[in-house]
From Swiss-Prot:
The lineage of its organism: Bacteria, Pseudomonadati, Pseudomonadota, Betaproteobacteria, Burkholderiales. Catalyzes the reversible conversion of 2-phosphoglycerate (2-PG) into phosphoenolpyruvate (PEP). It is essential for the degradation of carbohydrates via glycolysis. It is found in: Cytoplasm; Secreted; Cell surface. Belongs to the enolase family. This is Enolase. One of its GO terms (cellular component) is extracellular region. Its main location: cytoplasm. Its cofactor is Mg(2+). It holds the Pfam family Enolase_C. It comes from Paraburkholderia phymatum (strain DSM 17167 / CIP 108236 / LMG 21445 / STM815) (Burkholderia phymatum). (2R)-2-phosphoglycerate binds at residues 163, 337, 366-367, 388. It is an enzyme of class 4 (lyase). CDD domains: enolase (cd03313). Keywords: Cytoplasm, Glycolysis, Lyase, Magnesium, Metal-binding, Secreted. It catalyses: (2R)-2-phosphoglycerate = phosphoenolpyruvate + H2O.
């Protein structure tokens, strides 16, 4: 038995300099697991609650000492002595201890830190790499990365309304070569921006944040960078967007301030369809407001056969909401953010539900990240096929890519890179 003998929660800083929660779990054998949780900037209204202290004079109210105290007292008492290898039972214990629908009492940040740290300790105790512990012998597929090379919206201080403009390398035989492709396009884009006298400062997720005149201009410039790096747009590299449309939906209209547009749901669906016709876009995330299910249905009916439509704020990694979306034919993919739901067991359930329905599952970071690379192991362990973990700069993003390189090396000849086949929802 891998009995838990000590649990330590602490407050650390994330990539934006805001406090977040880290947890150490120690087993009877002396084995330890450590995990740190991320935090989002644009968040869905139905996400599990991230517990913050609200003390204005300390970290602007963003401290997490209450969440840490919950780990070091109530949670510690509840799971001390439990078997770390019994992940589902341990997560159930956490859920029952919290007793709320949205984890507002203990905090999803406290619960997730413990859930992840327990899994890491159990994997170490079993002598298995984390991805293998999660997925067993079937874990062998590396994910296709969606690399956020231009930041807008809530992730940057510029005029772009769409939050993320991503490149998706799909023709490469290995993850290593896909990563190289992304890095080369990133540096080609930096040179283009520099030559134009545009800003090469980066946003929260490591992408550039220049002031483009329009989304169209931004996408055209990315195509130039792909070609400048020696790749073929639409063949070697595809494009993806995260609209984060809930952020610019006001008074029943999609208000693209950067372009001076106010659009109805139908008009915004047409706007996105026009972009998809003009550019090699394979995926659009949060193309409608999280509460605009009629708009989502319009968008799905219009683009759902040829474009991956990812629900992030829409589904918030929640199986109850995802089930409703599947039944109503809304979207065809779910974004998986571990801190939206708060335990690994619930996270894995959302991935499996999506797959059973023919939806894809995209494993994702948050804009406030740490050096913790657990999501890389989840992506491989669950054979998710896709990952979103930022740009080709900032070590909080690169840590996940580097972990995937290590996993691919560890897998050796049995490692596979799915490329375009990762988008099985579009077949």
């Amino acid at each position: 038995m891998s009995a838990i003998v000590d649990i330590i929660g602490r407050e650390i800083l994330d990539s934006r300099g805001n406090p977040t929660v880290e947890c150490d779990v120690l087993l009877e054998s002396g084995t330890m697991g450590r995990a740190a949780v991320p935090s989002g900037a644009s968040t869905g209204s139905r996400e599990a609650i991230e517990l913050r202290d609200g003390e204005a004079g300390r970290y602007g109210g963003k401290g997490v000492l209450k969440a840490v105290e919950h780990i070091n007292t109530e949670i510690s008492e509840a799971i001390m002595g439990l078997d770390a290898s019994e992940q589902a039972f341990l997560d159930k214990t956490l859920l029952e201890l919290d007793g709320t629908d949205n984890k507002s009492r203990l905090g999803a940040n406290a619960m997730l830190a413990v859930s992840m740290a327990v899994a890491k300790a159990a994997a170490e105790e079993a002598g298995l790499p984390l991805y293998r512990y999660f997925g067993g012998s079937g874990a062998m597929q590396l994910p296709v990365p969606m690399m956020n090379i231009v930041n807008g919206g809530a992730h940057a201080n510029n005029s772009l309304d769409i939050q993320e403009f991503m490149i998706v390398p799909v023709s490469q035989p290995t993850f290593r070569e896909a990563l190289r492709c992304g890095a080369e396009v990133f540096h080609a884009l930096k040179k283009i921006l520099s030559d134009r006298g545009m800003s090469t400062a980066v946003g929260d997720e490591g992408g550039f944040a220049p002031n483009f005149g329009s989304n169209d201009e931004c996408l055209s410039t990315i195509l130039q960078a792909i070609e400048k790096a020696g790749y073929r747009a639409g063949e070697d590299v595809l494009l993806a967007l995260d609209c984060a449309a809930s952020e610019f939906y006001h008074d029943g209209k999609y208000q693209l301030a950067g372009e001076g547009l106010q659009l109805s749901s139908a008009e915004f669906a047409d706007y996105l369809a026009t972009l998809a016709d003009k550019f090699p876009i394979v995926s659009i995330e949060d193309g409608m407001h999280e509460g605009d299910w009629e708009g989502w249905k319009l968008l799905t009916d219009k683009l759902g056969k040829k474009i991956q439509l990812v629900g992030d704020d829409l589904f918030v990694t929640n199986t109850r909401i995802l089930k409703e979306g599947i039944e109503k034919g809304i979207a065809n993919s779910i974004l998986i953010k571990i801190n939206q739901i708060g335990t690994l067991t619930e996270t894995f359930a959302a991935i499996e539900m999506a797959k059973r329905a023919g939806y894809t599952a995209v494993i994702s970071h948050r804009s406030g990240e740490t050096e913790d690379s657990t999501i890389a192991d989840i992506a491989v362990g669950l054979n998710a096929g896709q990952i979103k973990t930022g740009s080709l700069s900032r070590s909080d993003r690169i840590s996940k890519y580097n972990q995937l390189l290590r996993i691919e090396e560890d897998l050796g000849d049995i490692a596979s890179y799915p490329g375009k086949s990762a988008f099985y929802n579009l077949r």
